[in-house]
Each structure stands twice: as C-alpha cells, then as structure tokens.
Amino acid sequence: MNGESGDAITSRRIVLGVQYDGAPWQGWQTQLNGLTVQDKLEFALYKFTQQTITTACAGRTDAGVHALEQVVHFDTTLERDMQSWVRGVNTFLPSSIAVRWASEVAHDPAENFHARFSARSRTYHYMLYNNPVRSPLLEGKAGWVFRALDIAKMQEAAAHLLGQHDFSAFRSVQCQAKSPVKTMHAIKIERRGDLIMFTVHANAFLHHMVRNIVGSLIYVGNGTQAPSWLKEVLAGQERKFAAPTFMPDGLYLAKIDYDPKWQLPQTEIQNFLWS
C-alpha cells in the first residue's frame, strides 16, 4: 500500500502522531541498512497488521534530530479502532520511538489529507546548553556552546529573518526544495539558567535551515558578528556567507499545523524540554 495515495474505495487514511529520540537513528527516511525511524515504524506496522504499509511524513528529519510530534499518514483497508493502532504499533517499536495518537481522516473529494502537503506551517525547537563545561546528561539532547551568549543581540539579529525571504544563505547544498523562498512567522529566543531555547515557526523549511540559522545566531551571541550581519547574510543568498551548520543534537520537530477541518488530536507545542 502506498502512503502517497488513497484511491482504493475501501481504503482508509490513518494519521499518526509520532514522537522519537533521534539520537540512535540515521534520520527519518528509509535506508538500506534499516536504521531509520521510518524503517522501524513501518516494521512495527507490518508486525501489527501483517501487511506491508508505506508511510508518508510531514518533515524528514536528519540523523540525530528529534520529534515531539511528527505527523505520519498511511492507507489501509484494515478496520481498527484508533487506540488499537496506538497500543498495537507501540508493542513493536523500540523505546526511542512511540505513537502518541492515531486518527482517521475523512475522504475529501477536493483534497485528500497528506501529512506533508496539507501542512500549513511547521515549528522547530532548538535547545542549547550554554555553559563553560559540557553536560553528559544532555549529550544528544541539546547543543552546547561554552562561550557566553548575549540573548538580546541574538533576538535583534533574528528580527531580520522575519517575513518572506529567499533563504538560500541558510540552505544545504543537498536541499531538494523547488524554491528557497519561505515565510518566517516567528523566532523566539528564551533563556532559563544555562539553557537557551530557540523556537522557529515558518510555513516550511529548507534542508538544514534551522541549524544554519541557529549557528549564525550563535556567531552574533558570542560577539563574532554584529546583529546587522544576519541581514547581510540573508541578502547575500549564498551558503558561504552564513555560519557553519550547527550540531543536530538539540533540534526538535515540535509541531505541524493543519486546517482544523482534519480534526487531528494534536497536542499543543510541548514545554517539557524546559522541565
């Protein structure tokens, strides 16, 4: 079965909210070695249904990147109640991956739901540990910068990225997006003790875009560059002008926004990263 289409009359489209620790896995997208989140989820679906099921996700996360709420859909002719999908699939998943909720979406002749293409916007968190000494307890869960960072300067710099822009300067050379033009809705930067949280909300993101933005904001925060530098980087529209891609450890896919008509049982953006 193909998660990309729902043409069969008897087919049902099921949507899952999936949370995972990305540290043990080589990203979302399936690979020959099978060490990805998609591979493990589809294996669990097979064990539960005894059918081969192909999934489609809202955003393909890289190796080491986590998800508070990845959204996934697939098609099936099987009839199961939603809690059965949650409990049954979780039985066969490793401890670092869990289905948090399941929902069936109604057939819409004008537009079938698609986890990726039906999304209106996305939100990512980046959690950064800012302390002279690294924390073993945050290994794989947060980025680390040992030099003191100025939050106010980073906030000033981030304001230059708001609105619709060509984000080529923050785009990976491997990026396959058709257009580098995206709309940045908000960038929020907060500090609690030694933890700094970047919350980035846009209509869509380019490959490595969040990590490249965070890396560039760190250059501003540690005094390497002035806040106005980020405006120049954006205008330059070339990857060479921005800072190097920052580590994946602290990046979390937090929320995918959809039209309320789909009635997905999504949670609000979770704050447990602060706890």
UniProtKB/Swiss-Prot annotation:
Homodimer. It comes from Herminiimonas arsenicoxydans. Its EC number is 5.4.99.12. Gene3D superfamilies: Pseudouridine synthase I, catalytic domain, C-terminal subdomain (3.30.70.660), Pseudouridine synthase I, catalytic domain, N-terminal subdomain (3.30.70.580). InterPro entries: PsdUridine_synth_cat_dom_sf, PsdUridine_synth_TruA, PsdUridine_synth_TruA_a/b_dom, PsdUridine_synth_TruA_C, TruA/RsuA/RluB/E/F_N. Belongs to the tRNA pseudouridine synthase TruA family. It comes from the Bacteria. CDD domains: PseudoU_synth_EcTruA. It catalyses: uridine(38/39/40) in tRNA = pseudouridine(38/39/40) in tRNA. Formation of pseudouridine at positions 38, 39 and 40 in the anticodon stem and loop of transfer RNAs. Substrate binds at Y124. GO terms for molecular function: RNA binding; tRNA pseudouridine(38-40) synthase activity. The active site is at D62 (nucleophile). Coiled coil: none annotated. Keywords: Isomerase, tRNA processing. This is tRNA pseudouridine synthase A.
